[in-house]
Amino acid sequence: MYDNLKSLGVNHPDDIDRYSLRQEANNDILKIYFRRDKGELFAKSVKFKYPRQRKTVVSYNAAEGYREINGISPNLRYVIDELDQICLRDQTEVDLKNKILDDLRHLESVVSNKIAEIEADLEKLTRQK
């Protein structure tokens, strides 16, 4: 699994925290950030440079004939797909944790309100006697 990342030398893909992608001249720059260990000030990262793929295509304008376009390298596209799988999985886990915590806080609020209501009813009963 994650063969493209392993071919780049990323032996522990589960340690990936996030990535960034930017374009510089005729290159795409991929930077992969790893989770920080306790006590580390900065996250470890690795940087990869991919040349942009150049294609010559027929222009829709008959006067121009052909034109050259730049695109993302197919290898980089495969690596990004794997990175998205890792990063989106982590995001889903964080979202689920936040949802559970929100549900727990809501439940705590409902229970404390119900306890207050029951105590008030008990207080009314004791005053009536």
Swiss-Prot record:
Pfam families: DUF3461. It comes from the Bacteria. InterPro entries: UPF0325 (IPR020911). Signal peptide: none annotated. The lineage of its organism: Bacteria, Pseudomonadati, Pseudomonadota, Gammaproteobacteria, Enterobacterales. This is UPF0325 protein SG1947. Transmembrane segments: none annotated. NCBIfam families: PRK13677.1 (NF010213). Belongs to the UPF0325 family.
